[in-house]
Amino acid sequence: MSSTTTAPALADLPRAIRERDAAAQAALYADDAVLTTIDAEHGPSNPVVLRGRAAIADALADVCARDMTHDPTFFVHDDELASVGVACRYADGLRVHCLAAMRLRDGLIAEQTTVQAWDS
């Protein structure tokens, strides 16, 4: 008898983002995934680069623990690519908007580039 494992459904990403479910989000990444983040403090020449599901899971746990809302504004995907927009708002009113583009492998996120714009 053989057993097979099924990758978590990428279609669950908007719910996991909205509900700040870091574990469900992390489960959508490949073990060797690379997450690159570009923002005002880390431009294209010096982005934040996280390598591996464990590092990405730690970052997601930090973000999801913050007192803020996460509202997915759009989400599209096929077998190879995905993209999501997320409007975030901290309790003090500060807003952040994130756009992410992802390359998929075997139903999991293998590479992601996120661009963040923060209120100043």
Predicted regions and their residues:
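Short, low-complexity N-terminal intrinsically disordered segments enriched in polar/charged residues
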Residues: M1-A27, D31
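A beta-strand edge to alpha-helix "cap/lid" segment located at domain peripheries
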Residues: S2, D58-S120
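A solvent-exposed, acidic/Ser-Thr-rich amphipathic alpha-helical stretch
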Residues: S3, A24-D78
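Short charge-dense sequence patches
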Residues: S3-R15, V48-R53, I109-Q112
